[in-house]
């Protein structure tokens, strides 16, 4: 397996361009299953999860051509409703094909998905929505089987504003003639980007003044042409890398308002934050000291759970102590013991992490256990004195395009290798 060797400390300097959002591209790619027409998606990042999705689409009957960030999806054969476990186990987002397949075929059989091992991430909210449409659910040899004789529009109230459930239910509703109302829906930019993509296919979707998603379903949808929104989590990761290393970095081709909460926290912590059209400039505190500012993860527009791990690194090098409360996922502090190996002072108490800043982190051998935790270890390595070796970087490759090249362009000394191939 590949690993990173990073020599620190370094103050990052320069400019970095943000890729298209993985979390937006994935559901939009799944949405191509809603039509037999040609779909063109631009700014698609070249990532492991994206490549897995291409394979899923091909198994289900699509032809996928990908070149230079543009994916062209066309019909190859009749849709298949059954997914292979070998692909589904690699990625939790694979369950997002359920909505389109149920809408098109009235039947789908999907193994329970894989992805990062972050606590309990159930699909029950998705299934409750499908039941409201008239579908029945059963299990068969570890697979979830969802089927219906007829699907009808419905009013659906989500018990939690789940991004995945909102996406799945909305895609399914777009092919159920009549009005579907989704209450307590997720408000993430990735949901809004999917809505934009579905509209190019002819879907009629709106968000009312109460935040409800209103879908006027159609019998068929047409072709799609869409450009994926900038990745707000990659943006936040580079913001935090610049901050933790007390660097001077301009982040380009981003959407600054998607990280408003994070930027406000950095201002409170003493950092220079300058925002322009599609760009963010981060500079170190004028007095050289990072004021500790605690966070609580919440659904958007609150603090993103996907940035909790990178933010913890910032607190590890701050002047003083502060707390992190993780209210979205269970067991999302798996990176903390690895940071402790590097000299961090972190105490975990159920959903809270108490972090006391230390004078300096030290290089160590550590292991990425999930995508965002892996990114946090990269930032910690950039702050640490000496060499840090990060194993299992395949987790990081799931969500960051050319991460080592982007950090190297900012002055990082980062090398990828595979010791088993040497």
Curated annotation (Swiss-Prot):
GO terms for cellular component: cytoplasm. It is found in: Cytoplasm. Pathway: Cell wall biogenesis; peptidoglycan biosynthesis. It comes from the Bacteria. It catalyses: phosphoenolpyruvate + UDP-N-acetyl-alpha-D-glucosamine = UDP-N-acetyl-3-O-(1-carboxyvinyl)-alpha-D-glucosamine + phosphate. Keywords: Cell cycle, Cell division, Cell shape, Cell wall biogenesis/degradation, Cytoplasm, Peptidoglycan synthesis, Pyruvate, Transferase. The modification 2-(S-cysteinyl)pyruvic acid O-phosphothioketal is found at residue 116. GO terms for biological process: cell division; cell wall organization; peptidoglycan biosynthetic process; regulation of cell shape; UDP-N-acetylgalactosamine biosynthetic process. UDP-N-acetyl-alpha-D-glucosamine binds at residues 92, 306, 328. Phosphoenolpyruvate binds at residues 22-23. Pfam families: EPSP_synthase. InterPro entries: Enolpyruvate_Tfrase_dom (IPR001986), Enolpyruvate_Tfrase_sf (IPR036968), MurA_subfamily (IPR050068), RNA3'P_cycl/enolpyr_Trfase_a/b (IPR013792), UDP_GlcNAc_COvinyl_MurA (IPR005750). Its EC number is 2.5.1.7. The active site is at 116 (proton donor). One of its GO terms (molecular function) is UDP-N-acetylglucosamine 1-carboxyvinyltransferase activity. Its main location: cytoplasm. Cell wall formation. Adds enolpyruvyl to UDP-N-acetylglucosamine. PANTHER family: UDP-N-ACETYLGLUCOSAMINE 1-CARBOXYVINYLTRANSFERASE. Belongs to the EPSP synthase family. MurA subfamily. This is UDP-N-acetylglucosamine 1-carboxyvinyltransferase. It comes from Elusimicrobium minutum (strain Pei191). The lineage of its organism: Bacteria, Pseudomonadati, Elusimicrobiota, Elusimicrobia, Elusimicrobiales.
